[in-house]
Design a protein with these regions (language model features):
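Phosphopantetheine-dependent thiolation modules in NRPS/PKS and related acyl-activating systems
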Residues: 1-19, 23-221
């Protein structure tokens, strides 16, 4: 087991994401509790202790997979018997009609898959261009304004990206399970505590932008 020390910026990203997690899962962590934590594992234990709901053995990710497979069959996107968790998403959603088919599945499921996402390189480039353009306002304002317009136009166009965020069905299911946990279980009064650490890890990895391998064994100090 490799222990990783999270840097100051990663810890700040976790703290920034925590408010959304608390709202999503309807819990509250006190500052006096979080200040004592030494690592991400203790953080997960604290979160789980806040759930007073009934714990049962329903495997939420498995249920999410079956719901996803049923949606594919119902919407006539692909023969559902031919897919498995390791199936490449490009096979399920080829470029032609990708956005339309994903929306059809989302409508059937009743929640967003968030399966499409621009590359981090694109986001970084647009952000860098925006910062550079703002700084340039003091020197060559006409060019700077043009750069700002390109940046905002680029950020707007990323909403229509056709790029798949995950590679396999398994990766997509892990993400959607974390983001729509109670909706997939169809109950807000129960959790599966044996799987919930994985859900917490996936959720914060996705929302704080920290790799799961680093976050799982991450130390705060």
């Amino acid at each position: 087991m490799k222990v990783n020390k999270l840097d100051r910026f990663e810890i700040e990203d976790l703290e920034d994401s925590l408010a959304l997690f608390e709202k999503t899962f309807n819990i509250k962590l006190e500052n006096t509790e979080t200040q004592k934590l030494k690592n991400f594992d203790e953080f997960c234990d604290l979160i789980i202790s806040k759930f007073k709901a009934e714990s049962n053995n329903l495997c939420t990710s498995q249920r999410a997979f079956y719901q996803f497979r049923k949606a594919l069959k119902t919407e006539n996107i692909i023969n559902s018997t031919s897919i498995s968790p390791n199936t490449d998403l490009k096979i399920i959603f080829p470029k032609k009609n990708r956005i339309r088919n994903i929306r059809k599945v989302e409508k059937h499921l009743g929640y967003k898959l968030e399966a499409l996402k621009p590359s981090q390189m694109t986001i970084n480039f647009l952000f860098f261009l925006l910062i550079l353009s703002i700084i340039s306002l003091f020197f060559v304002w006409k060019i700077a304004i043009f750069g700002i317009l390109i940046s905002f136009t680029g950020f707007y166009l990323t909403k229509f990206t056709n790029r798949l965020d995950k590679k396999t069905i398994r990766e997509l299911i892990e993400k959607t399970t974390a983001q729509n946990y109670f909706q997939i279980r169809n109950a807000e009064n129960s959790i599966n505590k044996s799987e919930f650490k994985t859900v917490i890890l996936e959720w914060f990895s996705e929302n704080a932008g920290i790799k799961k391998e680093k976050l799982k064994y991450g130390n705060f100090a």
